[in-house]
Design a protein with these regions (language model features):
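Short beta-turn/strand-loop junction motif enriched in small, turn-promoting residues
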Residues: 37, 84-86, 105
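Glycine-rich, charged/polar anion/phosphate-binding loops
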Residues: 63-64, 83-86, 115
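A short beta-sheet element
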Residues: 80-82, 91-147, 152-171
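Non-catalytic DNA-recognition/assembly elements of restriction-modification systems
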Residues: 1-6, 26-63, 68-80, 174, ...
Length: 226
């Protein structure tokens, strides 16, 4: 929550800390008109197309049918457009990635793209774009930025919605200066890493619960009398 609030404050409202640690725009920071974006942005900022800021790994995606997944049950998450669909016995990605729904359910109730942050060993099907920033130091900014794009600006189709590579990569984004991006990552990344550790601990405990509960139910395991 804090990461999203800080993103909105700094990169949407433009009230990042200035040289005097005061909110930039609210304190009269210089704003200039950007013709490509058709809006005012802070004086030292610029713009770019998303294709110049991110790398896509869609060519490495491999879809598996439900029948195939049934034959390959395992421990590695199998991701679709909106979340984990199954667990399989192999993986094609290992590390931190950002997923953005490509088709089917492409946006949430508020009209923003469905974006997931994943890490570890996993498998991703062909219904989610797989993304990292060209400078992987800016992963947290990229995650929040993608979540803030109005989906209607990159979607096509009236009934069956789709976010194509072309539309995604052609999106025109505000590009903050690198110093501010570094500051954002320095604040947010430690919080995110702590959150990841908590999620991993919860998942480990849930797995232990699921393994022990049937044994307790049928008397194969005894509770510690202490």
């Amino acid at each position: 929550v804090m990461a999203k609030q800080l993103y909105d404050y700094w990169f949407v409202q433009f009230d990042f800390p200035n040289e005097e640690c005061k909110p930039y725009k609210s304190s009269g920071g210089a704003m200039v008109w950007n013709e490509k974006l058709k809006r005012e942005i802070p004086q030292e900022w610029s713009d770019c197309k998303l294709k110049d800021f991110i790398n896509l790994f869609d060519s490495k995606r491999v879809p598996l049918s439900s029948k195939d997944r049934g034959k390959r049950q395992g421990v590695y998450p199998y991701y679709g457009a909106t979340g984990i669909m199954d667990y399989v016995n192999d993986y094609i990605f290992d590390g931190d990635y950002i997923l953005l729904a490509e088709d089917g359910s492409t946006s949430d109730a508020k009209g923003f793209p469905i974006v997931q942050y994943i890490w570890g060993k996993n498998w991703v099907n062909n219904h989610a774009h797989i993304i990292l920033p060209k400078n992987e130091r800016y992963t947290m900014f990229t995650y929040q930025m993608l979540r803030s794009i109005p989906a209607k600006q990159i979607e096509t189709g009236s009934i069956q919605k789709k976010i194509s590579q072309e539309n995604l990569c052609g999106y025109k984004m505000v590009l903050p200066n690198s110093d501010l991006l570094e500051k954002y990552e320095n604040v947010v990344l430690p919080l995110w890493e702590k959150r990841k550790r908590c999620i991993e601990e919860i998942n480990t405990l849930a797995k232990q619960r699921d393994e022990l509960l049937p044994l307790l139910m049928n008397g194969q395991a005894l509770r510690n009398p202490d």
